[in-house]
């Protein structure tokens, strides 16, 4: 499921290049392909996240998958930029529904907050695999003369298979959900909770920086956008040119590998220290890549994927684990809202800033570097103050029956 979702969402950098040519739109307009998708997820996460708590994980999951499949199949009849954008928005709404249900389900099957974090990294690792497959598949379709919208048709087919599988699987039922069903009002109240808000802001900053890589890195690394033969001619040798062409796929590959490693890592190391170290390395990659330019960024920007790998799954896991299981769908929706808001706002702001300075993507990466600096500062505070230690320990004992003085 996570892999199927990533095939479309993380291929947007490659798709934007095609959309700009096909519909003759600007960077700002083309970035709506990403921004509206994320706005759909954000709206759905905040206002529909409670569905997984109110009606159960299975029903909500199937509803979201069905909406996503329909939106994907409709890409075959889309012929205008406005219609394509409407489908992108609908698919985002669908993702928000099924992803909050899936995230809540992880809490139902976990036996501790530590196991929850490991499982979350595993699920997001498959997202990473989909993020590798998607851009490669788009590139292959285009070279074969097949329209890029077939990526969505393929995703719709996978989604249909997932619906059939979901119908046959028995899901664990949380007793708390039956006794205390959550409403939209309860979900919105979480916006005032410092734990939900803290992890949500962290997710916003992280995703704003991460999406800069897969949305705008292809544009940043291009030498001459006006000539296909000279597009990567500024790089010293053929191997570096090849890396520039496949930089997004390399980034996603490193991120996926890092998340599989993260399953083990989060079982053996203090999560606050791991996130602090990795956020520092992300900031360093952005700063040096921006200052040195594409010649060095072609190595550093993809490399940042290994350091980004465990941050978002851990934010998600620890944020959700700060609450009772009956609220997991709602809090997952709140975090997803800020996640999608960051993914929508980050690249859009970068596109606007780039257009304001003549269309050069490097000016947009100044914004992305700022996000990475704020992320590091937030995780530095988290590592020093440890604001969630007591809350996680309390939930560990109450919800999972594990008595511990600390939660890692």
What are these regions (language model features)?
Residues 1-21, 25, 99, 103, ...:
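Extracytoplasmic
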Residues 149-167, 363-382:
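Symmetry-related core transmembrane helices of the 12-TM Major Facilitator Superfamily/SLC fold
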Residues 10, 38-46, 132, 252-260, ...:
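Residue-level signature of mid-helix packing/kink "hotspots" within the transmembrane helices
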Residues 43-82:
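Conserved MFS/SLC helix-loop-helix module at the cytosolic interface between two early adjacent transmembrane helices
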Residues 83, 122-170:
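Helix-loop-helix hairpin linking two adjacent transmembrane segments in secondary transporters
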Residues 24, 56, 77-82, 270, ...:
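Helix-breaking motifs and short loop linkers at transmembrane-helix boundaries and internal kinks
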Residues 12-13, 194-249, 256:
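Extracytoplasmic gate region of multi-pass secondary transporters
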Residues 87-126:
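Cytoplasmic helix-loop-helix junction between adjacent transmembrane helices
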């Amino acid at each position: 499921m996570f892999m199927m979702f990533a095939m479309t969402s993380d291929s947007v950098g490659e798709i934007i290049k095609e959309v700009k040519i096909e519909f003759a739109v600007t960077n700002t307009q083309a970035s709506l392909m990403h921004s509206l998708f994320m706005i759909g997820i954000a709206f759905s996460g905040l206002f529909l996240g409670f569905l997984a708590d109110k009606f159960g994980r299975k029903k909500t999951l199937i509803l979201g998958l069905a909406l996503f499949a329909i939106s994907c199949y409709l890409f075959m009849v889309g012929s205008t930029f406005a219609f394509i954008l409407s489908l992108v928005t609908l698919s985002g709404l669908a993702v928000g529904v099924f992803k909050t249900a899936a995230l809540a389900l992880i809490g139902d099957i976990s036996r501790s907050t530590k196991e929850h974090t490991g499982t979350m990294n595993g699920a997001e690792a498959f997202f990473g695999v989909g993020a590798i497959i998607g851009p490669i598949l788009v590139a292959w379709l285009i070279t074969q003369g097949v329209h890029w919208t077939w990526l969505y048709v393929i995703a719709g087919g996978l989604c249909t298979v997932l619906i059939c599988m979901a119908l046959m699987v028995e899901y664990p039922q949380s007793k708390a959900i039956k006794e205390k069903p959550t409403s939209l009002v309860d979900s919105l109240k979480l916006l005032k909770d410092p734990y939900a808000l803290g992890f949500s802001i962290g997710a916003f900053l992280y995703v704003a920086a991460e999406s800069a890589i897969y949305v705008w890195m292809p544009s940043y690394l291009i030498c001459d956008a006006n000539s296909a033969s000279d597009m990567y001619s500024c790089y010293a040798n053929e191997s570096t040119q090849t890396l520039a062409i496949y930089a997004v796929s390399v980034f996603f590959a490193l991120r996926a590998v890092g998340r599989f490693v993260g399953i083990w890592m989060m079982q053996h190391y203090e999560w606050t220290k791991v996130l602090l170290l990795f956020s520092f390395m992300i900031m360093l990659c952005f700063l040096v890549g921006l200052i040195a330019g594409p010649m060095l960024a072609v190595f550093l920007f993809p490399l940042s994927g290994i350091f980004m790998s465990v941050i978002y799954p851990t934010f998600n896991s620890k944020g959700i684990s700060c609450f009772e299981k009956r609220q997991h769908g709602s809090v997952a929706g709140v975090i997803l809202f800020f996640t999608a808001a960051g993914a929508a706002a980050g690249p859009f702001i970068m596109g606007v800033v780039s257009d304001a300075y003549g269309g050069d993507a490097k000016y947009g990466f100044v914004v992305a570097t700022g996000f990475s600096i704020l992320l590091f500062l937030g995780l530095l505070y988290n590592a020093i103050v440890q604001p969630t230690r007591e809350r996680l320990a309390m939930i560990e004992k109450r919800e999972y029956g594990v008595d511990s003085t600390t939660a890692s």
